[in-house]
Amino acid sequence: MAETRIRRLPVGIQSFEKIRKDGYLYVDKTDIIWRLANTDNTYNYLSRPRRFGKSLLVDTLEAYFLGKKELFEGLRIIELEKEWVKRPVVRLDMSQAGAEPESVRSYLDDVFHTLEAEYKIVVRQDCSLAVRFKNIIEGAYNKTGQQVAILIDEYDAPLQHSWKTPHHEACTSIYREVFAILKANDKYERFVFITGITKFTQISLFSVLNNLSNISFEPEYAAICGITKEEMLRNFKPEIDKLAAYENHTYDEAVAQLTAYYDGYHFSHDNMADIFNPFSLVNALSDSKLRNYWAASGATSLLPKFVDNIEIRLKNFENCPIDSDTLETSDVTGGGAELFLYQSGYLTIKGYTDGIYILGIPNYEVRKALYKIVLPALTLKTNDQVISTQSMLLYNLQLGNLPEAMKCLKALVADVPYSNKKLASMDMEERYRLILSTIFNAIGCRVEVEKMIATGRIDMVVETIHIIYVLELKLSNNGGIHAATQQIQYKQYAEPFKADKRRVVALAIELDDQGKGLVDWKEA
């Protein structure tokens, strides 16, 4: 019997050379990469969310400019590139530079020292970082006779992490000093490529390089990072089959699950091809499990720095309009919460009309992560208190064990509408809807608030894997449990869902009109 060859998926690998030499699966993007490397624009900037393949893209560009043809054999670029010229490459990975001016200077000093040794550049003791950078670019050109490729990966990492700290202005000053020389040295530069997540326009990368081409929204580069559905189906069929077997699904059901969890990103209104988060997708296919990989990797750590009061604003981001100038050109520190959430991957483009983008949450993984993060702040509880209770709530909802589920829900809601002063501007029913929908989203349920059907408007529909819950909420001073039960029965709220193979449970819930929490419940 022939031995089955185990395919190697590049989980967390950002080295193009390692992927190619060690036999890892590579989704071929080299035709797009070649077009980028040979564009008429010398200076190019790409923004993509964290863990979206930017560093692998930079590493692939480095291999290309170093003329490493052997790494590209069998890929599309072989048909496009005829010369394979070896060029000098200056590469900076600013994610290694820390978040304080001393660490940024130390990182640049180390990189420059290595390059100066490589190109035999004599450095005066009093040389500034900017002068050293200038001398490296000129020296590399003079020694090789070839223009230099400059690759700056995660340029914004020190600026993000120092934001709202005493170190931010000093870090910004270093950027202004060092990177201002890029334009002055343009005759020595073949290609300059800068990647990041957020855009800080006050630094010299954007203010001095007025001819910097922002390719982040260009349709031809929409899929340069990430994995399209076509690429997933073409490259990962064995892994999808394996996931389907583990989850007891058909192949098509497994594809639908992967799509719901990790797909849904769009980066150009002129090219709305769905893009999967590559980090999450490859991890899921490697593990044969559907998990929240992106959030678990620390992707949500910067939210509190850039978005105030997100726990009460999150519902506003579901279908969020933002004008094109703000989304495409604004500084993250002054463009509002929507801009940061888009650049960081929490929101994506859902539509576009007459200069206005419509943004929304891309997929299940991001939705659950966002709501899970805001739940402790909204309920005024510690993370530890919330985690154990919400786990028990989901467990009992999935089993249909309503008495235990309602105990958990009561514990999470208790006193919150009254005690959380950030909710003071909302009426009491609106407070309860926000709290309950946040809880159900945070545990991974599919939630629809105020769902319209032929006979009326259902307060909330909550879907688990095996059960659909139809909720009618009534305050104690508005009829309470009796009125909620009557409305469910009279308007036949459960009927539209009975064609679903899942069990349907209609729940009447009475809520304290003073904001003290859940008073009573009844299966209607």
Feature locations, PLM:
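Phosphate-binding site recognition
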Residues: M1-M428, I443-C445
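Active-site metal-binding core of divalent-cation-utilizing nuclease and nuclease-like domains
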Residues: A140-T144, I439-I465
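Structural motif
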Residues: A149, I467-L471, V505
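Mg2+/Mn2+-dependent nuclease catalytic core
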Residues: E169-Y175, L475-A494
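Metal-dependent nuclease catalytic cores in nucleic-acid-processing enzymes
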Residues: V178-N185, L339-L347, S437-A442, Q487-L507
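Conserved catalytic cores of phosphodiester-cleaving nucleases, focusing on short active-site segments
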Residues: L436, M460-N477, K491
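Domain-level recognition of nuclease-like catalytic cores that cleave nucleotide substrates
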Residues: P496, D500-A524
